[in-house]
Amino acid sequence: MVHNETLLVERVQTGVRIEKRLLKVLKAFADYHDLTLGDLLEGIVLHAFDGKTPFTQKSLQRIRELKKFYGLELDSSASHRLKETKASRPKGGRDS
């Protein structure tokens, strides 16, 4: 695949629930790189699917700064262990 060609895709709107501070870091990081949140997430996921890191050392440093600024102390060890507080759960939401 040529890496500088534009690829046409069909995007869909989705609603996902995500940890509040994590979302703040992602939005700030996307804004820093002049990307939409969707573009950033697509890039992260596509890199992960290929077993590649999506971030340079400079980007990782910026992420560390943003995590500190927004008080995000979570790291990869928290994956799949997060549970919503009852106050943040939507009415009729599932407990999983």
Which residue stretches match the model-derived regions?
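Extended hydrophobic secondary-structure segments
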Residues: 17-23, 38-41
